[in-house]
Swiss-Prot record:
PNT domain sequence ranges: 129-213
Low complexity composition bias: residue spans: 1-20
Tissues and organs where the protein is expressed, per its UniProt entry: Expressed in a very restricted set of primarily hormone-regulated epithelial tissues with particularly high expression in the prostate gland. Significantly lower expression is seen in other hormone regulated tissues such as mammary gland, salivary gland, and ovary. Expressed in prostate carcinoma cells.
Pfam families on file: Ets, SAM_PNT
Job description of the protein: May function as an androgen-independent transactivator of the prostate-specific antigen (PSA) promoter. Binds to 5'-GGAT-3' DNA sequences. May play a role in the regulation of the prostate gland and/or prostate cancer development. Acts as a transcriptional activator for SERPINB5 promoter.
Annotated GO CC locations: chromatin; nucleus
Protein's name according to its UniProt entry: SAM pointed domain-containing Ets transcription factor
GO molecular function: DNA-binding transcription factor activity, RNA polymerase II-specific; sequence-specific DNA binding; sequence-specific double-stranded DNA binding
Summary of subunit composition and partner proteins: Interacts with the DNA-binding domain of the androgen receptor. Interacts with NKX3-1.
Amino acid sequence: MGSASPGLSSVSPSHLLLPPDTVSRTGLEKAAAGAVGLERRDWSPSPPATPEQGLSAFYLSYFDMLYPEDSSWAAKAPGASSREEPPEEPEQCPVIDSQAPAGSLDLVPGGLTLEEHSLEQVQSMVVGEVLKDIETACKLLNITADPMDWSPSNVQKWLLWTEHQYRLPPMGKAFQELAGKELCAMSEEQFRQRSPLGGDVLHAHLDIWKSAAWMKERTSPGAIHYCASTSEESWTDSEVDSSCSGQPIHLWQFLKELLLKPHSYGRFIRWLNKEKGIFKIEDSAQVARLWGIRKNRPAMNYDKLSRSIRQYYKKGIIRKPDISQRLVYQFVHPI
């Protein structure tokens, strides 16, 4: 009846069977389609199932199948992420419950919990590194490791080095003309009064040096200690090696060592009545720390130390004086 549409006869019949946007495919899509045809001539991808899915998404999805699995940088088709497996959760470190009942904690040799044992190992490593640093500083500054032996010029050297190492404000003028003994006799509060900005930190570092010197003295071949001559109950002033023929030093012997050196440890422990053997622990934390250093137990605290002291009540070595006071004790057999 009517003639065909003017433009219809000029269109290839094969184009009539394809979707409109196939004609406008890019060169990249044609090349990809050709490559696929060479590799697998017996199979070709199906066109989009629905009109809403464009050919661009279709070809991207198809190209995604050609990439190796480890090409995580390659572009993924919309919805491809839904096929991915959920990421694995990072492995959690075991948590030690320090509040758990005593019966539920794992114990290591020595009666310590696993947590305490690990803490002591770490602290021992830290102490070792600190001692190395102090030894290095002594060589650089040409000073002794014991602050008690420092001259005023040695004190100034140590102050400059500590300020530089730990980025502290200049404090040399605040401690001029002070020798090592005078510096060691000062309290933390006195350090703060002389240097409000860094006095407390400086006092802490000096305390580390004093402890290190004390450790070195105790472990040196010529170190002398006080031990029982016959039994724990009958101790004397004789100076003998702390090993006592292979036996470790006892706490009461250690306390006596501190008491007999008031110039070094008078701030921590002192005699109230030496003739009667009455003494007072002024700084329980420091005494416990020194005892921990001696026994190589960095996690030592006063709770543990006081339990050991109370055990001496039954053995007749230490007791509470007639007028009971906090942190005041009496040797049953005075000097």
